[in-house]
Design a protein with these regions (language model features):
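Active-site-proximal, Lys/Arg-enriched surface segment
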Residues: 47, 73-146, 264-271
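Contiguous, well-ordered alpha-helical segments that form the cores/surfaces of helical PPI scaffolds
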Residues: 43-47, 137-139, 349, 353
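Gly/serine-rich nucleotide phosphate-binding loop at the start of the catalytic core
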Residues: 1-76, 80
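Hydrophobic, Leu/Ile/Phe/Ala-enriched alpha-helical segments that form helix-helix packing faces
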Residues: 48, 64, 92, 177-184
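Short, glycine/acidic-rich beta->alpha junctions
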Residues: 52, 81-84, 130, 195-198, ...
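Single, function-defining residue in the core of a domain
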Residues: 1-29, 37, 97, 110, ...
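Generic structural signal for well-ordered secondary structure
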Residues: 53, 64, 68, 81-82, ...
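Short gly/ser-rich anion-binding loops that grip negatively charged ligand groups
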Residues: 50, 125-128, 163-166
Length: 414
């Protein structure tokens, strides 16, 4: 159980610390923002972490210090979320850690006839296309810490809009990355994505931006050994590829085993040629005790097999960002019909989670995001009560209240 002196703060201390984390992230931003806009963003991020249940403009007015119209106007303004979140990332991650860019589209439940870009998108939970919205989340993953910071969320146009501009989903995802590639390359030149993105067009698009792709292939992918023989001198085109890889009868003279403590299977790596990707790849083969296999790859053939599997497995940390944003900071809650307000709400939801992770790290808080939100909510209500009532409580009473708040949060985490 977390002791009171561990946080070393009064009732408003946890709130002030959270706001200071949000305020410090502006230090690395080159853009000049007026004080009023900065203050509005900091308060909005705090409220996203404080407000229970549904988070919308009405709730922001109810819990905040501004009117509803002020929040509506704030949500229409442009803000460099990726630069801001990169500052938060630098606080949370160590400079020398292995990092990569993780991308993952996610279905957002939404109804209404006038919501911009509403349509049918694939829902992994439902296993089918459902009516709603989709956002492409772009995050930075720390392979050594097994954590993720969401950098940017971009809404995906519906199929009608994409068809009108002659664009496919893959083309759109590449355009999103193209717009922010300079910032992303500051973090890493590796992009990690799920099997949907293991397409030649996507890998080629990343190549043109200076990225390598780390992903997974279909289990029945057509892969070939690299031909390492000498030219025969015969007429005709020289042999480029070797034999097709038979995963039930691997040629162990052409592959290397990766040491692993996992007794459930074995890992092998080699450079292979992929017919689907139309290129050489660094391939990692995982075979379990039953003989079934999974295929992972990187378009960087100089990447080690160990890194390929570590990078891909860490990709799942972005799923936890989605989970926390959906459960605690209202990723699904925005009822706006303005694409700018939707964009602001999506990104504020993820950024509030990023700041919370830093707060948990600074205080060595061992419990969950749910318990931290409970602590923030209780602290906010008490702080608001004392400020509005004009009461200056005895310091002993305040310390007792702080201990009770922390104990409640720790109890919920148990």
């Amino acid at each position: 159980m977390l002791s009171t002196h561990k946080l070393d703060m009064d009732i408003s201390g946890s709130l002030n610390q959270y706001m200071n984390i949000c305020r410090d992230a502006f230090a690395g931003s080159a853009a000049k923002l007026n004080i009023s806009f900065k203050s509005a963003i900091i308060e909005t991020l705090l409220l996203f972490m404080v407000i229970p249940r549904k988070i919308n403009f009405t709730q922001l007015e109810r819990y905040g210090t501004r009117c509803e119209q002020c929040y509506r106007q704030t949500f229409t303004k442009e803000f460099d979320w990726i630069r801001y979140n990169m500052e938060l990332m630098n606080t949370l991650f160590d400079r020398n850690d292995r990092k990569a860019i993780a991308i993952d589209p996610s279905y957002i439940s939404k109804s209404g006839k006038h919501t911009p870009w509403i349509g049918y998108f694939w829902s992994g939970c439902a296993g089918q296309a459902k009516r709603g919205l989709e956002i492409l989340g772009v995050g930075a993953i720390d392979i050594d810490k097994r954590d993720c910071v969401m950098l940017k969320a971009e809404q995906t146009p519906d199929t009608i809009t994409l068809d009108n501009v002659g664009c496919t989903l893959i083309d759109w995802y590449l355009k999103v990355l193209e717009r922010i590639k300079d910032r992303l390359l500051e973090v890493s030149n590796y992009v990690v994505a799920d099997a949907y993105f293991s397409k030649a067009t996507f890998a080629k698009g990343l190549d043109s931006m200076g990225f390598h792709l780390v992903s997974r292939l279909r289990d029945d992918a057509n892969l070939m050994y690299i031909h390492d023989g000498q030219p025969t001198g015969k007429r005709g085109r020289p042999k480029v590829h070797g034999d097709k890889i038979d995963f039930k009868h691997l040629d162990y003279t052409k592959i290397q085993e990766i040491e692993t403590n996992n007794e459930d299977g074995k890992l092998y790596t080699l450079i292979a040629y992929s017919q689907a990707m139309k290129r050489k790849i660094r391939l990692v083969i995982w075979i379990n005790k039953k003989g079934k296999h999974k295929l992972y790859f990187s378009t960087d053939i100089n990447m080690s097999g160990r890194d390929v599997i570590d990078f891909y497995r860490t990709r799942f940390q972005i799923e936890f960002c989605y989970r926390d944003a959906k459960q605690f900071t209202g990723l699904y809650h925005s009822q706006a019909r303005d694409i700018r307000r939707l964009d602001f709400a999506f990104n504020a939801s993820f950024t509030a989670i990023n700041a919370a992770k830093i707060m948990m790290k600074e205080n060595s808080i061992p419990f969950s995001m749910e318990a931290l939100k409970s602590l923030m909510f209780n602290s906010y209500l008490l702080d608001r009560f004392f400020k509005l009532s004009g009461i200056k409580p005895n310091s002993r009473i305040k310390d007792k209240l702080v201990k009770e708040l922390i104990d409640i949060a720790a109890y919920q985490a148990a």
